[in-house]
Design a protein with these regions (language model features):
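Bacterial N-terminal signal peptides that target proteins for export
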Residues: 1-8
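Predominantly soluble domains enriched in secretory-pathway, periplasmic, or organellar proteins
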Residues: 10, 14, 18-320
């Protein structure tokens, strides 16, 4: 009887969704992971596996070697470390009230988990599967992003006016970068050369900041509401959604202008490109779909039904 129960539990925790059969392999050069916040699960493409029992799966990051996922919970104070192959939860770590963004460093050693309710970021040893330090970063942090060499990390301060800078050698906050003109610094990314910080806000603006001079280079109006932001590999475009609208904005980083708006359906939030920069995956929250945009033609080439509720964030191996 115990064996039957164990098998049933495994099956319920790791299901293959019907969207797998409809996922052309050429659209997915590397694995893509999507949080289904309303279904307590993370789904993967192109294989179609879905891993359940992840309470209100909110943000997700994948390790550089593709072996681990770091997933935050919108309804508890926890983050989960998950085996990216089997879906097994390897560790559940308490990080404080209102967990938000998560990120794994370029070497795979450290993970970062943001707690908006405690104004902190928890540093996690991804090999030992344990927290190693909690860093107070500023008012209402939201998400984090590592520099390419892993020595620095940046954390948006949604309750402030910019981003905190963390030294990942000393595991300490070393300063803040002002981002004037935006309301609630929300999500972030770095340019391909690491010189420009891109910040998406809560209400419909994107700012670009020169990290050497700390000067704001541009303030760009985009779709309403909050969303993710992605400088695609190669740096040709910057994409951002807008959860209160229905389009993804395409920004030319050379001119800081929106060159196109791509209609994907109501509520686009998470955006992340394939590791080769050819495809953009968009979590469309109100339609429960994943839209795939061709970054050459800037057109939607496929819409996948997630067979889950509230697809929120997207992680792609090779594009952290």
């Amino acid at each position: 009887m115990r064996k039957i129960v164990a098998i049933a539990a495994f099956v319920s925790a790791c299901l293959v969704a019907p969207w797998a059969a409809a996922a052309p392999l050429q659209l997915f050069p590397s694995p893509v992971y999507v949080t289904l916040q309303g279904s307590d699960s993370v789904a993967s493409l192109p294989g179609g596996a879905r891993w359940n029992n992840l309470d209100s799966a909110h943000y997700v990051a994948v390790s550089p070697d593709g072996r681990q996922l770091l997933v935050s919970s919108a309804s508890t104070e926890n983050v989960f470390i998950v085996d990216a192959k089997t879906g097994k939860t390897l560790a559940t770590i308490a990080v404080g009230a209102v967990p938000q963004g998560v990120e794994i460093g370029p070497h795979g050693w450290f993970g970062l988990a943001v707690s908006a309710g405690t104004d902190s970021v928890t540093v996690i040893d991804m090999r030992a599967l344990k927290p190693v330090k909690k860093i107070i970063v500023g008012k209402t942090p939201h998400n984090a992003h590592f520099a390419a060499d892993g020595q620095l990390a940046y954390v948006t301060l949604q309750g402030g006016t910019g981003a905190a800078v963390l030294d990942m050698r000393s595991l300490a906050k070393t300063g803040e970068i002002a981002v004037p003109g935006i309301h609630g610094p929300h999500n972030l990314d770095l340019s391909a050369d690491g010189r420009v910080l891109w910040v998406r806000d809560l209400t419909g603006s994107v700012a670009a900041v020169d990290l050497r001079t700390r000067k704001e280079l541009a303030l760009i109006p985009v779709a309403p509401g909050h969303a993710g932001i992605d400088v695609i590999p190669g740096g040709r475009y910057v994409f951002t959604g807008g959860i209160a609208g229905h389009v993804v904005d395409v920004i030319d980083p050379a001119t800081f202008k929106v060159v196109k708006q791509v209609d994907v359906g109501q509520g686009p939030h998470g955006v992340r490109a394939s590791r080769d920069g050819r495809w953009l995956y968009v979590a469309v929250t109100a339609t429960n779909k994943i839209a795939v945009i061709d970054t050459h033609s800037l057109k939607v080439v496929k819409q996948f039904d997630t067979h889950g509720k509230l697809p929120f964030w997207v992680a792609v191996r090779g594009n952290n």
